[in-house]
Amino acid sequence: MLEVQGISKKWKDFHLKDISFSVMDGEYFIVLGPSGAGKTVLLEIIAGIIPPDGGKVLLDGKDITLLPPEKRGIAYVPQNYALFPNMSVFDNIAFGLKVRRVPRSEIEKRVLEISEVLGIRHLLHRKPRTLSGGEQQRVAVARALVIEPEIILLDEPFANLDVQIRSRLINEMKRWRRELGFTAIHVTHSFEEALALGDRVGIMLNGKLVQVGEIREVFSRPNSEEVAKFLGFENIIEGIADGRVLHVGKLRIELPLEAKGRVRIGIRPEDILISTERIKTSARNVFKAKVEAIEDVGPLVKLTLNVCDITLRAFITRSSLVELGIEEGKEVYASFKASAIHVF
């Protein structure tokens, strides 16, 4: 088990603040946050590349805070993969084993085994410059795993890949983990990677680890408005709660639980259903709305709605936009279930 206890670090204009969490053996732990949150600095401290100003890193109960990287039993895959350009793929993968003075026959056996699992055995004679981004990523992961580390650290491993390759390698990473059973800390800004790969997640914002928990629990129940906004709860509404009803001006919103006094709620845009007529639905919150803006957001369309002078944002598909004849100024109905609401 890896334990990070109260790690702090001032780095240029950045401050990592009292970071604590643990990773169990066999766990895939995601550190999720925006660019500049301090994710890479945290990984480099765990890897031993830079020292912390305070706090400890323990591996299986042993304090490794001041140990050099090569004595930690930890493998680190940086974002740029850091492959040796003058070496073949075989020699890149074998590098850590050679440093550890593993016998040549054992090196060859382990390199062939890991390259078979990762699907790169046919590339062993090649140089890194002749490889695609996805192939380089596989080589970097193979080089890390072949030394059989206690834990592997992955810094935005899919960030430099195009969408199709990234999606394929995420699925392959699941398979590699099943077959090899490794423990990992994976830092990313991608919700897709977090949801697809993680057992637990730590949300990192402005140098602080602000929430840690099971992936689905954190995504559905953020512990603060700050976390909710980062996780896509674009609709944050403040009002006065009286039992299971929130009063927001003329609006009455049914809540999923009893509350009293001034509270805030969060609703994801994808949880709001749009229709041009009032429809039969189990949703207890159905409101007439006016479309104020229409914005393309990749495969979806975001609608900005005015509901009794309250702004709501909702997603619909392009085909639904056309089929419903929705345009700016049109009146529609917006509905959402009480269970889709998160109360802060």
From Swiss-Prot:
Gene3D superfamilies: 2.40.50.100, P-loop containing nucleotide triphosphate hydrolases. Transmembrane segments: none annotated. It is a peripheral membrane protein. One of its GO terms (molecular function) is ATP binding. GO terms for cellular component: plasma membrane. CDD domains: ABC_ModC_like (cd03299). Residues 2-231 form the ABC transporter domain. GO terms for biological process: molybdate ion transport. Its EC number is 7.3.2.6. ATP binds at G33, P34, S35, G36, A37, G38, K39, T40. Keywords: ATP-binding, Cell membrane, Membrane, Molybdenum, Nucleotide-binding, Translocase, Transport. It is found in: Cell membrane. It catalyses: tungstate(in) + ATP + H2O = tungstate(out) + ADP + phosphate + H(+). InterPro entries: AAA+_ATPase, ABC_SmlMolc_Importer, ABC_transporter-like_ATP-bd, ABC_transporter-like_CS, Mo/tungstate-bd_C_term_dom, Molybdate/tungstate_ABC-ATPase, Mop_domain, P-loop_NTPase. PROSITE patterns: ABC_TRANSPORTER_1, ABC_TRANSPORTER_2, MOP. Belongs to the ABC transporter superfamily. Sulfate/tungstate importer (TC 3.A.1.6) family. NCBIfam families: Mop, tungstate_WtpC. This is Molybdate/tungstate import ATP-binding protein WtpC. It comes from Pyrococcus furiosus (strain ATCC 43587 / DSM 3638 / JCM 8422 / Vc1). The lineage of its organism: Archaea, Methanobacteriati, Methanobacteriota, Thermococci, Thermococcales.
